[in-house]
Amino acid sequence: MDHTYQYSWIIPFIPLPVPILLGVGLLLFPTATKNLRRMWTFLSIFLLSIVMIFSLYLSIQQIFLSCIHQNVWSWTINNEFSFEFGYFIDPLTSIMSILITTVGILVLIYSDNYMSHDQGYLRFFAYMGFFNTSMLGLVTSSNLIQVYFFWELVGMCSYLLIGFWFTRPIAANACQKAFVTNRLGDFGLLLGILGLYWITGSFEFQDLFEIFNNFILNNRVNLLFLTLCAFLLFVGPIAKSAQFPLHVWLPDAMEGPTPISALIHAATMVAAGIFLVARLLPLFIVIPSIMYIISLIGIITVLLGATLALAQKDIKRGLAYSTMSQLGYMMLALGMGSYRSALFHLITHAYSKALLFLGSGSIIHSMEAIVGYSPDKSQNMILMGGLTKHVPITKTAFLVGTLSLCGIPPLACFWSKDEILNDSLLFSPIFAIIACSTAGLTAFYMFRIYFLTFEGHLNTYFINYSGKKSSSLYSLSLWGKEEEKKLNRNFGLVPLLTMNNTKRASFFCNKTYKISNNVRNQIFITIENFGLNKKTFYYPHESDNTILFPMLVLLLFTLFIGAIGIPFNQEGIDFDILSKLFTPSINLLHKNSQNFVDWYEFLRNATFSVSIAVFGIFIAYCLYKPFYSSLLNLTLLNSFQKWNSKRIRWEKLINFVYKWSYNRGYVDAFFKTSLIESIRRLAKQTNFFDKRIIDGITNGVGITSFFVGEVTKYIGGSRISSYLFLYLSYVLIFLMILFFFYFEKF
């Protein structure tokens, strides 16, 4: 065991050789490096697998021995200051390491196929390897300075990966937005770290917690200043985990490749904020006001993310807002002091959401064969539908992930989300109502995504896709961006769908066309010819095995990973793995952890939460499932016509929800108006002051001197005697003025 912990410092550096060798190889031997690109993929997977085995071994030891190991090296700069760096291994570290490596390995396997056509294939794997190193370094850090160092590296990797297709203006803007937003959080985190060091004189976690708690108990420091430092520490996780109000970067981050969304924006990077709050929870927990702020930010994010996901057309943006909402659940649990349930949901959500993102990537990959390589088309759920018979394996995996996220037993997220909902009932009735209501909204928008994507018929061929929208048909695009025309409810839906559309287009002719190699200079990768004069329709196809295999593995995780947190610790049974791993753990709501679970209460609460989820699924079914199948006679719409006043109120509500969701809750607009425009006005005023006032004074002195010289030259007539006469005259006048003022004092 000692040898295992002794060499744990190497964990973050095991994946590092790949990005280093790729960088050197592309610089010195570009042709050979590119020809061996599959070898780099295998090496990345192999090295990350070593870290995974190492992390599993550490976790098994901690389950049975409940030990924490820390090793620190000191670098003494002078007698008063020394920098300490090392590694810290505890259950939280081992859990995060397993999460990073398992999802990372599967994403690397997936990316080998998904990115195979891309000219930046090797650059992608170099970024991925560097990101894995940064994330592993973050979770094994023993002090706040190391955390901040790797925190910044993670942010840099996120910037590079979001802007991977940097020739597309949208992707370039998205990575800049993510970078700037996270810099705001990082600045707050840095101020908090410096403030804590000024108070305690230490960066080490263990020393920091002990000194901080002593200060609080003995009232030896200003509580307001301590609270301010703790809040500044929390600002970093607010930005990194996309919590309100610094969540605005996450949906735009979907402009990166889909495997990045699965790894960084579902399982690891956005979980870094949750990790840091969990790591610093012994510090936050002694300040009740900070704990309440954490829970408040969490519950606001839970509701906001769910409402913003209600009317998204882009499948990845819908999943991004779902991620934001689920991260809010974790932050809520940490704010309530429910350490175990927060980390449990972190684990279950990571695998479920990674499955959903990889499933969406498989769908996008299939749709690109029909609509081209434009994300506006291939990711648009309005153009999908009826994919069940075309991509059955992807559909099954996506359905399991959707059911898990909705909280349907016995899938993974049911167990963790149910714990958070139960704890919210003990913490605050208002928070419990919001959390439970959002569980219903989660089921609604997730099955909205599922129905729009997989049920009905392929909508691509029901829409005039020649660049203009068919007004009558486009009104069927539920909550589309420009849905101006109301649906005429005086005729049935079947004639509307089967009407003759003379401009119906096919998107591939019988010939095969190559993709242009000059990809880097194009905004989108486009197919050279769509054969618009043909009437042959092509349909999506199932993805290759290297795309399906990671999805099936994640499906197994989604089915069974919840078992590690099921409370089996009844009389004669002791099988609660997660509780063993987090012993001793922090829980303000269940202080007596030895009590057995009341299964009657558990079943009652579970029935309530599942009923809410089922109700959300039913509403989604009523609104989205019938349009091509079960409600062909427009029964639902006809029922609304019978109660005209209710129908008007219903339409107003739907329009309000759509506008709220489409405009992102007006948070981006608020930031643009109040912050960005204000900064631009200030920059213009500063530019004016600098050029007109500061430069004006300098230039004015120079111009004045120039004109005085010219006047003097003109008066002197270019003769030395005239210059001497003027010089002596000026000196005489100056002496007379000085003499006059000198004698005036007397």
Curated annotation (Swiss-Prot):
Gene3D superfamilies, sorted: 1.20.5.2700
Topological type in the membrane: Multi-pass membrane protein
InterPro entries: NADH_UbQ_OxRdtase_chlpt_su5_C (IPR002128), NADHpl_OxRdtase_5_subgr (IPR018393), ND/Mrp_TM (IPR001750), NU5C-like (IPR003945), Proton_antipo_N (IPR001516)
Transmembrane region(s): 9-29, 40-60, 89-109, 125-145, 147-167, 185-205, 221-241, 258-278, 280-300, 327-347, 354-374, 396-416, 425-445, 547-567, 608-628, 723-743
Alphabetized UniProt keyword annotations: Chloroplast, Membrane, NAD, NADP, Plastid, Plastoquinone, Quinone, Thylakoid, Translocase, Transmembrane, Transmembrane helix, Transport
EC number: 7.1.1.-
Class of enzymatic activity (EC top level): translocase
Gene Ontology biological-process annotations: ATP synthesis coupled electron transport; electron transport coupled proton transport
An annotated GO cellular component: chloroplast thylakoid membrane
Major localization class: plastid
GO molecular function: NADH dehydrogenase (ubiquinone) activity; quinone binding
Cellular location(s): Plastid, Chloroplast thylakoid membrane
Disulphide-bridged cysteine pairs: none
Keyword presence, NADP: yes
Subunit and partners: NDH is composed of at least 16 different subunits, 5 of which are encoded in the nucleus.
Family from the record: Belongs to the complex I subunit 5 family.
The protein, known as: NAD(P)H-quinone oxidoreductase subunit 5, chloroplastic
Organism encoding this protein: Crucihimalaya wallichii (Rock-cress)
Gene: ndhF
